C-alpha cells in the first residue's frame, strides 16, 4: 500500500498552481518553435485518389484513427482530474492515444482514476510516474499501482531533471534511475514509455534507454509550455534570476529527430 506523505500533499496543491500558471504567457518558451520554420513541399501532380488516403495505424495493439497522442499533462487534484476526463472522452471519440500526468499524488491519496478507462475503452491509455519516484524504495509498487488503476496499456516514466532542480520542492537525486527503468521493463506487465517534459531526449540518452529494453520514447523537446518557466514563476525573484539561463533550455525537435533515425529500426 502507498501511504500519503507530506510531499504527496504538497504535490497535490502544487498541481493546481501549475494549471493556473500554464495558462499564462509567462509559461511559454521564448523561442520560435522549430516546426513552424519547416515548409512542406507542395505536389501539384499527386497521381492518387484522396479517398484512398488511410491515416489509421496500430499503437499498443489498438487501432488509432491517425498517429497522435494527447500526452500526460496533469492530474491528482479535482481540477486536474476533470481535465483528464475531458481529454479521455475526446481522445476516445477521435480515436487517438491518451496519457495522464503523474499518478503519484492520486495513488498516494487514494484517489482512483478508473473512470478514465470507462470513458475511453477503445484507445491506448498510458499511465505515468516520475523517474525519481521509480528509483525510490517503493517505486516498483507505485508503478504497478499506476498500471492497475487505469488498466493502462503502457506506463510512461517521465524524466524531468530540469524541472525538479528549479521546483521549490523538487527532488534532486537521480542516482539509479536507469537501473530502475531496466527492472521495470523486465518485470512490469505492460510496455514502458520514457518521456521528457520539454527539454528533450538526446541520442546518447536514447541509446542508453534502448540498451535496457525501452522501445517507446517521447522526446518532448523545447517549444510550447516550459516547465522550467512555470517552476521559476513560483520562486522569489532573487532565485528566479539564478535560473534565467535555463528557462529556454532544451533540445530542438528538428535536431533530435534526424539523430533518432540512427536507432529508428530498434525503437
Residue ranges and their predicted role:
Residues 17, 27-35, 59-61, 85-91, ...:
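A broad, low-specificity signal for short, low-complexity segments enriched in glycine/proline
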Residues 93-131:
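A gly/proline- and charged-residue-enriched helix-loop-helix capping module
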